[in-house]
Amino acid sequence: MKQQIQLSDHFTYGRLIRFTLPSIGMMIFTSIYGVVDGFFVSNYAGKTPFAAVNLIYPLLMILATAGFMFGTGGSAIVAKTLGEGDKPRANRYFSLFVYVSAGLGAILAVLGIAFTRPLARLLGAEGEMLEAAVLYARIILLVLPFNVLQMLFQSFFVTAEKPQLGLAVTVSSGMTNMILDAVLVILLPQEYKLAGAAAATALSQVVGGGVPLLYFGRNNDSILHLSRTACDGKAIARACANGSSEFMSNISMNLVGMLYNIQLIKYAGEDGVAAYGVLMYVSMIFSAAFIGYSIGTAPVFGYHDG
């Protein structure tokens, strides 16, 4: 049995790939269960709900990217502090980024719910498609803080030297989504199928964000745990700066999707948006591998810089 790789180890190319494989698998699996979600909606809820989900989904992802920013940016800072040998300060930074991310997620959730309808209308939704997009988005936005935390913890599991545990949580979250999709979307009456799909996704995000919160909130065998902290504007700004590339990459990718949808709904209608949604799912799977690699390597570079 191979020895567990630690951040303090000397990394060769092979060791680095081994260390990042769980992060890559974690992101790919996240993308795959998104595809399964689309499969159930398109096959059981209908074309209009599927088009509505694809229309509003990039907007929901943009709101959740704060988790990527504080995850990749914050994990580099925490890893650097661990490399300097200051574990208490590293845990204070870790706790700060978790609390700020959860608070920001709550604020964005309130704003998102309040402005869902005008934003969906701005994207070109109208009539039945508008109502479907608003319904789906508002259910997902109710648990946005957990979605933000899920993205945040995907990075910090690596920093805590627990990438395999991060993969296990992601698989559990994905299986929750798939099973609930199969139960709710197939068994519920037609008028409730889209709400069932949204509820399945929302509950899976509660698992993905809530389980790590409980794990790090208690005594555990990792090098990180939640503790009392104080507001540190400089640390927050550094995390935002460090994670700005991942933040902008995710925003730009989803913004392009939104712009495509605006034009497609204008010239091709629901069929165009639904067709582009299938292509978007395929693109997500391929890009997930590179995002997973960046999540896995950031703490390594941060630790050795410290």
Each model region followed by its residue ranges:
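Signature of the first transmembrane helix
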Residues: 14-75, 244-265
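Helix-terminus/linker motif at the lipid-water interface of multi-pass membrane proteins
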Residues: 32-50, 120-127, 183-192, 247, ...
